[in-house]
């Protein structure tokens, strides 16, 4: 797909360090190109997806993964929500998905800020690196860069965490971490 439909991103794809980064980048590229919905395999739908399509009015839709985060990369910009990437919807060629892709290509979060995040976060440095380069911290930074225009955030709450708003439940937060080996997809 990348070689034939979006060859300008192939070099970025093959140089991502971890397989999970390649998977993240691939899903953004496919959704940008075709439009549609991405759901991790552990997302249980509570309503038919038609409801999402009718409610979004050509907006991108992403979940708020958590409120009141402490990652200084984000909080220093007066923003405290973490936007998840385990489920999202976008019409084709949406500029917010393009913002995410561009931020991956140019490594929007600097290596210095990644090192600071690795020192502050309790997760292993390799996982924090993924959060900052293709995962939720990168998506959140992209949202801050882009602004709220045409992006609908579906909130969760303390009583019902890990929700894709009213659409679904994300059951296994961080399940990718179990087998996070530095293999690449070619």
Predicted features and spans:
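Glycosyltransferase-associated regions of secretory-pathway enzymes
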Residues: 1-23, 39-186
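Small-residue hinge/turn detector
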Residues: 24-36
């Amino acid at each position: 797909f990348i070689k034939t439909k979006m060859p300008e991103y192939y070099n970025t794809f093959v140089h991502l360090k971890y397989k999970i980064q390649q998977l993240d980048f691939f899903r953004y590229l496919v959704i940008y190109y075709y439009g549609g919905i991405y759901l991790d395999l552990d997302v249980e739908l509570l309503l038919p997806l038609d409801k999402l399509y009718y409610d979004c009015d050509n907006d991108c839709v992403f979940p708020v993964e958590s409120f009141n985060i402490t990652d200084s990369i984000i909080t220093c910009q007066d923003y405290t929500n973490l936007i998840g990437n385990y489920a999202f919807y976008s019409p084709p060629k949406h500029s917010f998905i393009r913002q995410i892709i561009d931020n991956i290509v140019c490594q929007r979060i600097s290596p210095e800020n990644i090192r600071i995040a690795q020192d502050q976060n309790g997760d292993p440095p390799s996982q924090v690196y993924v959060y900052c380069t293709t995962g939720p911290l990168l998506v959140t930074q992209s949202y801050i860069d882009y602004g709220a225009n045409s992006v609908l955030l579906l909130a969760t709450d303390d009583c019902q965490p890990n929700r894709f708003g009213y659409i679904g439940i994300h059951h296994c937060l961080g399940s990718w971490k179990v087998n996070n080996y530095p293999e690449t997809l070619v």
